[in-house]
Regions:
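Acidic, mature catalytic/reactive cores of soluble proteins
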Residues: 1-184
Length: 184
């Protein structure tokens, strides 16, 4: 019975966009006061996605991968900075206004500490690999848009410096180099 109740809770947490399940909300309890708990967090969706993959609900994971990939270029760009094309949002949710559905993203603007979500894209790539291994849908991973996005992620993570927001203002040690590890 506990496993069935966990599956029921997972099903209640599904977020839909254009009639398709695209993720899960962080919490289903409306009494929870955190403003963003109705959102799907990229990193936190991965355990749910693994359950969906193990139970044959592959479409939810594929919908998530596609939706999040297309959200990557939506981040607000601060003056003096440029858009980091491989960056993914920390979270997203769907709003309905005037009969239209719209996906609203958070690239760290509403997060605790306002930290840029640099790990989201890695979780997306890990989940992409799990999806392909589980489903055998290699064609999805080989699509031109998916390959282009993987290239953007690798470009983001392999460049010498990462600039999307003024992180040193929040972490003074990073600005002075005090947080560097000793290298042999």
């Amino acid at each position: 019975m506990p496993i069935q109740s966990a599956h029921d809770l997972l099903n209640r947490s599904l977020i839909y966009y254009q009639g398709r399940p695209v993720g899960t909300a962080a919490a289903c309890d409306e009494r929870v006061s955190a403003a963003n708990y109705n959102e799907c967090f990229i990193r936190d969706f991965v355990p749910s996605a693994l359950v969906f993959l193990m139970t044959g609900r592959h479409d939810i994971v594929r919908n998530f991968l596609e939706t999040v990939m297309h959200l990557s270029g939506h981040q607000h760009v601060m003056k003096g900075h440029r858009r980091s094309m491989g960056l993914m949002p920390a979270s997203f949710h769907v709003v309905r206004e005037d009969g239209e559905e719209k996906v609203v993203t958070d690239f760290g603007d509403r997060a605790i500490g306002r930290v840029t979500p640099v790990d989201s894209a890695m979780w997306w790539m890990i989940l992409l690999r799990a999806y392909v291994v589980t489903t055998g849908d290699q064609a999805f991973a080989e699509r031109e848009d998916v390959q282009g996005y993987i290239a953007n992620i690798l470009d983001l993570y392999l460049r010498e410096r990462f600039e999307s927001s003024p992180t040193p203002a929040f972490f003074p040690a990073a600005k002075s180099g005090d947080c560097r590890r000793s290298r042999p």
